[in-house]
Amino acid sequence: MATVSSSSWPNPNPNPDSTSASDSDSTFPSHRDRVDEPDSLDSFSSMSLNSDEPNQTSNQSPLSPPTPNLPVMPPPSVLHLSFNQDHACFAVGTDRGFRILNCDPFREIFRRDFDRGGGVAVVEMLFRCNILALVGGGPDPQYPPNKVMIWDDHQGRCIGELSFRSDVRSVRLRRDRIIVVLEQKIFVYNFSDLKLMHQIETIANPKGLCAVSQGVGSMVLVCPGLQKGQVRIEHYASKRTKFVMAHDSRIACFALTQDGHLLATASSKGTLVRIFNTVDGTLRQEVRRGADRAEIYSLAFSSNAQWLAVSSDKGTVHVFGLKVNSGSQVKDSSRIAPDATPSSPSSSLSLFKGVLPRYFSSEWSVAQFRLVEGTQYIAAFGHQKNTVVILGMDGSFYRCQFDPVNGGEMSQLEYHNCLKPPSVF
C-alpha cells in the first residue's frame, strides 16, 4: 500500500507508520523540467540547505576566525554508498545528510548536511540529474524510513514523496521509472507523474536487492523470486516474466549489464558467480571467487561486458574476464571450457575436469586488489581503460588499474577519504 503526495519539505511526516498524504496543487516536474545531461557536472545545484528554522542566522561572519575551544566534530558515520548508473559519480548517505562526489577526477560535487538528525540511509542518483531519491535511516533519521523523498537539488527541497506501510529497503531510478523495494514487495512507478505501473511480490529481501537496465526503450528488471536461490526477470517491452534458479542457497547479490542482456548472480555461500542470459535464462559462464564462504558485497559489469568486478568481506576485489560475447553458451555449469588466454586463468588440470572436482576446473579472477578486512566495499569499473573504483564504508576511495594480459595484483592509482571536511577537497 502506498500513497503519493507533493512535499513541502522540511516538514516530513514524523510518524513512520502513517501512509497519509496531503493534497497539493503542485505537480511533479516532467523530464523537460529536470537537467538530464549525463555529461554535465553543472547540472548539480550548489544550493545549501536551510535548517528547520528558516529565520535562524549565524552570529559568526564567514571571514571570522574559528571560535576557540569548540569541540572537534567527529566525522560522520556512513549509512549508504552507491554509484550512479554510469559509475561516473557516487553518493554517500551519512548520519548527518548526504553528499555527491565525482570519481574521475575525484572531487566532491556537493553535500547537504542537516542541522538536527539528518540520517539518510538511501541516496539514489539519476545519472548526473538534479533529481535524487532519499530515504531516512540511522539512529536519528532525517525522513521516515517508510517514505521515499524525491529531492530536487535545483530547488533545494523535496518535491514529492511515496509513503508505504513498511520500511523502504532500496530505490532504483531510470529516466522513466522509479522502483521502490520493500521487504517482500516491489513497486514500479512512472517517473513523470508517480503513477503506480506494476507491483511484484518477492521472498524476504532485507537487502533490497533489485537491478534495472538503463538502456533507452525496453526495461529489464531483476529481483528475487518467491523461492530461495531464484531470481525473477521482468521484460517490460515483451511483457514476459522469466524465473531462473540461479543457486541452491539464497541470493546475496546480483547485477545487470546496462542493456539488461546479462545477469551476474552470487549466493550466500559467495564462492561462485554465475552469468545468465536474461532472455532465455541460460547459464553463460561460471567463475570462482574462492573456496571458502564469503559475503559478496557487490557485482559490477564493465561497460562492454568484458569484465566483472566482485567485492566481498574477505577484503579482496576480484576482476574476472568474461567470454559471454563470444557466443559460446554454457549448457552444463560443471563443464565450463577453460580460456587459453591469460585474461581468464583456470586450472592446468583442466584435461581431467570430468574426473576431478569442479574446483580444479574453475575459472579464477584475472586481477585482484587487497584491502583491509572488516570494512564493506563496493566496486565498479572506471571510465579510464582497465580501471576499477572501490568505495569503502569507512569513507575510503581507491582507483586502481589492472593488466588485462598478465593479470595479478592491481596497481593503486589514488586514494582519498570522502568523509574529510569540504575544505580538504
Curated annotation (Swiss-Prot):
Membrane topology label: Peripheral membrane protein
Organism from which the protein derives: Arabidopsis thaliana (Mouse-ear cress)
Major localization listed first in the record, in broad terms: cytoplasm
Region spans: Disordered: 1-76
Protein name: Autophagy-related protein 18a
Free-text disruption phenotype from the record: Mutant is more sensitive to nutrient deprivation conditions and exhibits an early senescence phenotype. Prevents autophagosome formation during starvation. More sensitive to methyl viologen (oxidative stress) treatment and accumulates a higher level of oxidized proteins compared to wild type. High sensitivity to salt and osmotic/drought stresses.
Function: The PI(3,5)P2 regulatory complex regulates both the synthesis and turnover of phosphatidylinositol 3,5-bisphosphate (PtdIns(3,5)P2). Required for autophagy by autophagosome formation during nutrient deprivation, senescence and under abiotic stresses, including oxidative, high salt and osmotic stress conditions. Cooperates with jasmonate- and WRKY33-mediated signaling pathways in the regulation of plant defense responses to necrotrophic pathogens.
Source superkingdom: Eukaryota
Pfam families according to UniProt: PROPPIN
Family from the record: Belongs to the WD repeat PROPPIN family.
Subunit structure: Component of the PI(3,5)P2 regulatory complex at least composed of ATG18, SAC/FIG4, FAB1 and VAC14. Interacts with WRKY33.
WD repeats: 73-111, 117-161, 246-286, 291-330
Gene3D superfamilies found in the cross-reference section: YVTN repeat-like/Quinoprotein amine dehydrogenase
Residues spanning the signal sequence: none
